[in-house]
Amino acid sequence: MNYLFKNGRYMNEEGKIVATDLLVQDGKIAKVAENITADNAEVIDVNGKLIAPGLVDVHVHLREPGGEHKETIETGTLAAAKGGFTTICAMPNTRPVPDCREHMEDLQKRIEEKAHVNVLPYGAITVRQAGSEMTDFETLKELGAFAFTDDGVGVQDANMMLAAMKRAAKLDMAVVAHCEENTLINKGCVHEGKFSEKHGLNGIPSVCESVHIARDILLAEAADCHYHVCHVSTKGSVRVIRDAKRAGIKVTAEVTPHHLVLCEDDIPSADPNFKMNPPLRGKEDHAALIEGLLDGTIDMIATDHAPHTAEEKAQGIERAPFGITGFETAFPLLYTNLVKKGVITLEQLIQFLTEKPADTFGLEAGRLKEGRAADITIIDLEQEEEIDPTTFLSKGKNTPFAGWKCQGWPVMTIVGGKIAWQKESALV
């Protein structure tokens, strides 16, 4: 099916929001211009809505294989499509881990059969993510690994991390890191700060993250490797990443929507839906994350979509697993709380969710360019809705944002020229 989207707006190559039509033919973007006509295409009048590149998320947890009670590739990618994401990168903390040919081939087969959006799987750095034996990077790259990470646990052994970075550099691949110094975690379930003290909870100190990032940055410099930092959350982390970039070290970084919107002061009680890793930090940390995003220290926004069951989250804040679901709330949360409040511009938000992650990892995505795959999201910037977890397509309903009123909701998502999801009656 060919589609002609009429009367939309998009961000052009100069970074300006302008009027446009967009023609999709044979799964590709055929033309982006005003006043397009086409005889062999279904016309969809988007009536002034935003025509955006499909959103790109480099940090997601689909749970399959091994955690299908939390999420599956099918439910997770449907949720991604509903959130406007057309390319997502799946973390390897599954069971089994994609750490060898057999496991990666099985994962790729599942993706091919079940995914509703483009899914790029990470390869594990170490076998079973146990930290003691490196995987075969060459084989995992051959089988389509997006990059290498032991996300969820991090690589504690510096010698192992250096060896991994050297091997990844030879393959022109990135090493992506969840940064925690295990000896500093202190069995914490929240940030070590006012909230942990008030509720008598073990806290995770900020230095737990920043000291690990500092170590890895020096290792990356020694290995001449592209090193990407997951979910930055502290002022100290922003500082060391900024200094590393100024020194010319190949480091990039991401921040989550929840760390941009919330801090520990926003936690109403010991609610497990506010438990994520890294935890919500203090006001100064939150301000540093915004500053880092604006000055280029932090390159992109990634959801860290981490679904869990209601039963798991009901165990209380100390026993419940870390993580919140993120696909279906990311854009409206960021648009409402950052763009509408003048913290960043709409153009910047689009870049942080599309071209910045795509360019950082060399993906042919994130831009509405003629000849590229038609990965497109239509967003109604005027639509206001209340976040209702019962409507999520994700199996995970675990969100701290239930009841929040937000504007800027995706209404249609196109992947490879096919409609992957659309809001009923939104474009008729």
Swiss-Prot record:
Gene field: pyrC
Matching PANTHER family: ALLANTOINASE (PTHR43668:SF2)
Amino acids binding Zn(2+) 2: D151, H178, H231
Listed cofactors: Zn(2+)
Reaction(s) this enzyme catalyzes, per UniProt: (S)-dihydroorotate + H2O = N-carbamoyl-L-aspartate + H(+)
GO biological process, one term: purine nucleobase catabolic process
InterPro entries for this protein: Amidohydro-rel, DHOase, DHOase/Allantoinase_Hydrolase, Dihydroorotase_CS, Metal-dep_hydrolase_composite, Metal_Hydrolase
Coiled coil spans: none
Assigned GO CC terms: cytoplasm
Binding site for Zn(2+) 1: H59, H61, D151, D304
UniProt binding sites for substrate: H61, L62, R63, N93, N277, H308, F322, G323
Family statement drawn from the similarity comment of this UniProt entry: Belongs to the metallo-dependent hydrolases superfamily. DHOase family. Class I DHOase subfamily.
Species in which this protein is naturally found: Bacillus cereus (strain B4264)
One function term, GO molecular function aspect: allantoinase activity
Pathway where it operates: Pyrimidine metabolism; UMP biosynthesis via de novo pathway; (S)-dihydroorotate from bicarbonate: step 3/3
Protein name, as recorded: Dihydroorotase
Record function comment: Catalyzes the reversible cyclization of carbamoyl aspartate to dihydroorotate.
Pfam families: Amidohydro_1
Catalytic residues as annotated in Swiss-Prot or TrEMBL: D304
